[in-house]
Amino acid sequence: MEFSSQDDDFGGDDSAANATRASGNRRSFGDLEDDEDDIFGSTTVAPGVRTGMILSLRGSLKNCKDDLASCQNELESAKTEIQKWKSAFQNESFVPAGKSPEPRFLIDYIQNLKSSEKSLKEQLEIAKRKEASCIVQYAKREQEMAELKSAVRDLKSQLKPASMQARRLLLDPAIHEEFSRLKNLVEEKDKKIKELQDNIAAVTFTPQSKNGKMLMAKCRTLQEENEEIGHQAAEGKIHELAIKLAMQKSQNAELRSQFEGLYKHMEELTNDVERSNETVIILQEKLEEKEKEIERVKKGLEIVSELVGDKKDEVDEIDEDAKEEIAGGE
């Protein structure tokens, strides 16, 4: 509210006129019902002091208006920032279609992320247990493969020339002892054969005879059958071991591929969990900062509103008193 120059100086320097007005027509502050509410203290306050107080209150009101304008600008900037965040979250999957983004949607999304993280951790624990069992099975398979390889080496050594095989067998004390026992038995058998041959020769039984030819033919047949049976047994065992080895190799390859796939899946799950944790932490920090900023702006606005209301009431009372004084002086 603006005042004229006459209203500001209350009649200029004419002290006599002021005194006449004060003694004649001006209403005294003593006539007020409550003297304690008199902001000027008493009726002896000079008009210049009142004018200074009015001017100071006007300056305070202007400062309050400036503060209010700055606070409103800050509020607008905060609203703009909030709108930016809302527009940033508008196209996110956790915001329902046709609705504006709200903090509860973000909180629900974060809670869902936490629950999914918990389920992923449980799946990771299950995968780790499966991995441990696969490692144990793989170790068992490796041990079986080592045993099969040793068996194959033994079979290969059995297929080597007789001299090398005999030399290797003689290095074993148990085999050497068995070989010595068999050698003694062979010598005894040779002695018995010689005695039998002597007896046959004594009864004129020779290989050229009919019985001798039949016996020799039967012996050759038995020897061939024994050799064939030995070859068949050796070949069947080798073939069986080769089949088992091929099956074991295929199983090991399958287990290895499954283990590699499981390991890749675990790495992907770990990366997803880490990214989810980072996103959740960043969003929580930003949300806390914005909440603090909004609370700070609200508190500032409340304080400014209270100050502006008090200042306006004081200025209105002073203006009314000034008008009444001016009217009474006139």
Curated annotation (Swiss-Prot):
Region Disordered: start and end of each range? 1-43
What does the subunit section of this Swiss-Prot or TrEMBL entry state?
A: Forms homodimers. Interacts with MTA/EMB1706. Interacts with FKBP12; interaction is inhibited by the immunosuppressive drug FK506. Interacts with VIR. Associates with MTA, MTB, VIR and HAKAI to form the m6A writer complex which is essential for adenosine methylation at specific mRNA sequences.
Q: Which InterPro entries match?
A: WTAP
Whether Cell membrane counts among this entry's keywords is no
The tissues in which it is expressed are: Ubiquitously expressed with higher levels in primary and lateral roots, leaves, trichomes, and in pollen grains (at protein level).
Mind telling me which Pfam families this protein's record contains? Wtap
Supply the name of the protein: FKBP12-interacting protein of 37 kDa
- Family according to the record: Belongs to the fl(2)d family.
Coiled coil: which residue ranges?
A: 56-308
Q: Where is the composition biased (Acidic residues)?
A: 1-12
Ranges of Polar residues composition bias in the record: 17-26
Summary of the knockout phenotype: Embryogenesis arrest at the midglobular stage.
Under the cellular component aspect of Gene Ontology, which terms does the record hold? nuclear speck; nucleus; plasmodesma; RNA N6-methyladenosine methyltransferase complex
The UniProt function text for this chain reads: Probable regulatory subunit of the N6-methyltransferase complex, a multiprotein complex that mediates N6-methyladenosine (m6A) methylation at the 5'-[AG]GAC-3' consensus sites of some mRNAs. Associates with MTA, MTB, VIR and HAKAI to form the m6A writer complex which is essential for adenosine methylation at specific mRNA sequences. N6-methyladenosine (m6A) plays a role in mRNA stability, processing, translation efficiency and editing. Essential protein required during endosperm development and embryogenesis. Involved in endoreduplication, especially in trichomes.
Q: Which UniProt keywords apply?
A: Acetylation, Coiled coil, mRNA processing, mRNA splicing, Nucleus
Q: N-acetylmethionine: which positions carry it?
A: 1
Subcellular location, in the record's words?
Nucleus speckle; Nucleus, Nucleoplasm
Keyword Transmembrane included in the entry's annotation = no
Q: Name one GO biological process term.
A: regulation of alternative mRNA splicing, via spliceosome
Query: Disulfide bonds, which pairs?
Result: none
